[in-house]
From Swiss-Prot:
<keyword id="KW-0812">Transmembrane</keyword>
<feature type="topological domain" description="Cytoplasmic">
    <location>
        <begin position="93"/>
        <end position="157"/>
    </location>
</feature>
<feature type="topological domain" description="Extracellular">
    <location>
        <begin position="244"/>
        <end position="276"/>
    </location>
</feature>
<feature type="transmembrane region" description="Helical; Name=11">
    <location>
        <begin position="455"/>
        <end position="475"/>
    </location>
</feature>
<keyword id="KW-0813">Transport</keyword>
<feature type="transmembrane region" description="Helical; Name=10">
    <location>
        <begin position="428"/>
        <end position="448"/>
    </location>
</feature>
<feature type="transmembrane region" description="Helical; Name=5">
    <location>
        <begin position="223"/>
        <end position="243"/>
    </location>
</feature>
<feature type="topological domain" description="Cytoplasmic">
    <location>
        <begin position="502"/>
        <end position="707"/>
    </location>
</feature>
<feature type="transmembrane region" description="Helical; Name=6">
    <location>
        <begin position="277"/>
        <end position="297"/>
    </location>
</feature>
<feature type="transmembrane region" description="Helical; Name=1">
    <location>
        <begin position="35"/>
        <end position="55"/>
    </location>
</feature>
<feature type="transmembrane region" description="Helical; Name=4">
    <location>
        <begin position="195"/>
        <end position="215"/>
    </location>
</feature>
<feature type="topological domain" description="Cytoplasmic">
    <location>
        <begin position="1"/>
        <end position="34"/>
    </location>
</feature>
<keyword id="KW-0630">Potassium</keyword>
<feature type="topological domain" description="Extracellular">
    <location>
        <begin position="56"/>
        <end position="71"/>
    </location>
</feature>
<dbReference type="InterPro" id="IPR053951">
    <property type="entry name" value="K_trans_N"/>
</dbReference>
<feature type="transmembrane region" description="Helical; Name=9">
    <location>
        <begin position="403"/>
        <end position="423"/>
    </location>
</feature>
<protein>
    <recommendedName>
        <fullName>Probable potassium transporter 17</fullName>
    </recommendedName>
</protein>
Length: 707
């Protein structure tokens, strides 16, 4: 096995199979990686590679000179090199969580290795994680920093807030990328036709986005095969135009690679130069997708695609744009279309529009995935999540989120109008996500990889200073449009925190008032309690004990089904749960009463393809458990007969619906937060429809909890 950057990776099939077998496997892997690298062009890099459409138009330049443009290009070159190549390609892609990437994947990785999750039900221990289980006891021993997080609830809450903020900013990216990409592409129509007004461009852009959002429910499988060719055409044509501009306008542009031009730029422009960082930061837009989309592609494929095509394409395209602008210093307001030669103007307009649509689709799909992960882990109110492809598990769609995104995207276009105002808002999202990644990645280095503090500091200090400078610059844009992502992120964070707080209080109440097996036996021994025919799936949120709603149910209904299975849906801070560990069954003691835990990770499909299928899977696991477990008080044949008779009598799914009753003596914080939670709980979907239970088999039992 190979140990690489803290993750363990099994040998490939060709290793150890002889020289010929090894060469065949290596050749096969090379072609597979190249094909995956080609596919990443249409999914991963859409936002990054289309950034030349709006970087220069988003800058607030005032009488720029040749020296200014050389300094700006030098800043963009080193930003792409340091953040794109060094940070993401060389370092961040190694901080995966079982192949999944992104800020929340790093958070889940930290929670497992240092046991710093907030809710006990969300923690994962060594026996549940094959990576942790395979490590030695010394490797699993927490570091000093890990112990600090374990002992400080405040530090753990801050860490959760940082991870949640990263998710909220990514959702903000899903609002702004479609708006700025499509608007910047369609704005090219005003070049040949100056009489076309900006409101017409905005209306066309809004119409395209509305059509794109309305098509989301059909999935992208039928058209996704076009994404990579479109982005490949864009990726390879823009640098060709860039080379033409370099030769034609300014052959010496690459002298700007020298950091001297950055120093000279800031010394010359001082405060204005610092403020211009709010525009240059957009050159790295979409780089976070390299890490966030790691679960859909291999690390090597993303590295190959970025280093062989995306990075050279952006370097040459920006060099060509800058070379053109040095000779046409006042054309920065339309810095992309002005540098496109007239003979290829309309073909490039078509390619740019299609590329902007593909980039928008990539961010919309990423937003759906983030929302799905949050719902699965119970950090976000339940919304409908539909899998639009039978072959691609990660292809999901949420109707509620889709229409909210559509309204916000169209509102951004019509409300902000120009790309410069949207660019101000966009810069805040871009750099905040990257700064959060830097912080979490440093924690991963120290706590998990056990990187010496000196080496971790060599990573953290330069990137924190560079990204901190960008953050300070984009914060000055808050009055000019930068407030939008903050408003969206704060709203989302309030929703997630309110939901989390209510779920935590509910969990604490259930743990305090849980029903023990002894108490269940006493309830069933009462003469008025009858065992009625049927198979009952009784859903609970706790593993150790039974939900207090059970006592409420038995006392009021005076009955319990002959076979009752208490089902706990347990979300783990892992990407995926092995199928063999998905459903766990155990006997609880009383006749016909069993416990079942359904485990899933944040990248798993929560739905088990319909209620009948869930009943069949759990029943099948229970039958196997009965046959293998010889410690029962009754014979396996007798228990099997009872289970079959109960199944034939009818299946019912029972879920408790506990509501908070906030009394007059409750504190002001509880009144606000629990009232907000009750509002969210009232408008969100029930857990049973999310699992696909048939309507006629569902029963909900209400119970009030006085605070």
């Amino acid at each position: 096995m190979d140990l690489e950057a803290g993750s363990i990776r099994p040998r490939s099939d060709g290793e150890g199979g002889g020289p010929a077998a090894g060469r065949e496997t290596d050749d096969s892997n090379v072609w597979k990686d190249l094909f995956l690298a080609y596919k990443t062009l249409g999914v991963v890099f859409g936002g990054l590679v289309t950034s030349p459409l709006y970087v220069y138009p988003s800058m607030n330049l005032s009488s720029p000179t040749e020296a200014d443009y050389l300094g700006i290009y030098s800043i963009m070159f080193w930003t792409l090199t340091l953040i794109g190549v060094v940070k993401y390609v060389c370092i961040a892609l190694n901080a995966d969580d079982h192949g999944e990437g992104g800020t929340f994947a790093m958070y889940s990785l930290l929670c497992r290795h240092a046991d710093i999750g907030i809710l006990p039900s969300k923690r994962v221990y060594a026996e549940e994680d094959p990576l942790l289980h395979s490590q030695s006891a010394i490797a699993r021993r927490p570091s000093r920093l890990g112990k600090f997080f374990e002992q400080s609830i405040t530090a753990r809450r801050v860490l959760l807030f940082v991870a949640v903020l990263g998710m909220c900013m990514l959702i903000g990216d899903g609002i702004l990328t479609p708006a700025i990409s499509v608007l910047s592409a369609i704005d090219g129509i005003r070049g040949p036709f100056p009489t076309v007004s900006k409101p017409v461009v905005e209306a066309l852009s809004a119409a395209i986005l509305i059509g794109l959002f309305l098509l989301q429910k059909y999935g992208t499988s039928k058209v996704s095969f076009l994404f990579s060719p479109i982005m490949a055409a864009w990726t390879f044509t823009t640098p060709i135009i860039g080379l033409y501009s370099i030769v034609h306008y300014y052959p010496g542009i690459f002298k700007a690679i020298s950091p001297y031009y950055i120093v000279h730029f800031f010394l010359r422009n001082k405060r204005q130069g610092w403020q211009l960082l709010g525009g240059t930061v957009l050159c790295i837009t979409g780089a976070e997708a390299m890490f966030a989309d790691l679960g859909h592609f291999s690390k090597k494929a993303i590295q190959i695609a970025f280093l062989s095509s995306i990075y050279p394409s952006l370097v040459l395209t920006y060099a060509g744009q800058t070379a053109y602008l040095i000779n046409n210093v006042n054309d920065f307001g339309d810095g992309f279309y002005k540098f496109v030669p007239r003979p290829v103007y309309w073909p490039m307009f078509v390619v740019a529009t299609l590329a902007a649509i593909v980039a928008s689709q990539s961010l919309i799909s990423a937003t759906f995935s983030v929302i799905k992960q949050s719902v699965v882990l119970d950090y976000f109110p339940r919304v409908k999540v539909v899998h639009t492809s039978q072959h691609k598990e990660g292809e999901v769609y949420s109707p509620e989120i889709n229409y909210i995104l559509m309204v916000l995207c169209v509102g951004v276009i019509l409300g902000f109008g120009g790309g410069k105002a949207i660019g101000n808002a966009f810069g805040v999202v871009v750099i905040m996500v990257m700064l959060i990644t830097t912080v979490l990645l440093t924690l991963v280095m120290i706590i998990i990889w056990r990187t010496p503090l000196v080496l971790a500091g060599l990573y953290f200090v330069p990137f924190f200073i560079m990204e901190g400078a960008y953050v300070s610059a984009v914060f000055t844009k808050i009055p000019e449009g930068g407030w939008l992502p903050f408003a969206v992120s704060i709203t989302l964070a309030m929703i997630m925190f309110g939901w989390y707080y209510g779920r935590q209080r509910k969990f604490e109440y259930e743990m305090t008032n849980k029903v023990s097996l002894e108490h269940l036996g006493e309830l069933l021994a009462r003469p008025e309690v009858q065992r009625v025919p049927g198979l009952c799936f009784f859903y609970s949120n706790i593993q150790d004990g039974l939900t207090p709603i059970l006592s409420h149910y038995i006392k009021n209904m005076s009955s319990l089904h002959t076979v009752t299975i208490f089902v706990t849906l347990r979300s783990l801070l892992v990407a995926k749960v092995d199928q063999s560990k998905r459903i766990l069954i155990n006997r609880l003691g009383p006749n016909g009463v069993y416990g079942c835990t359904v485990q899933y990770g944040y990248a798993d499909n929560l739905s088990l393809e319909g209620g009948d299928d869930l009943a069949a899977q759990v029943t099948s696991c229970l039958q196997w458990h009965i046959q293998m477990d010889t410690d029962g008080r009754r014979s396996p044949e007798e228990e099997m007969a009872q289970l079959e008779a109960a199944r034939l009598a009818g299946v019912v799914h029972v879920r408790g619906k506990m509501r908070f009753y906030v009394g007059e003596d409750a504190g002001w914080f509880d009144k606000i937060m629990l009232g907000f939670y009750e509002f969210l709980h009232g408008i969100c979907r029930s857990a049973l429809p999310v699992l696909g239970m048939p309507l006629q088999q569902r029963v909900e039992i209400g119970m009030l909890y006085k605070v």
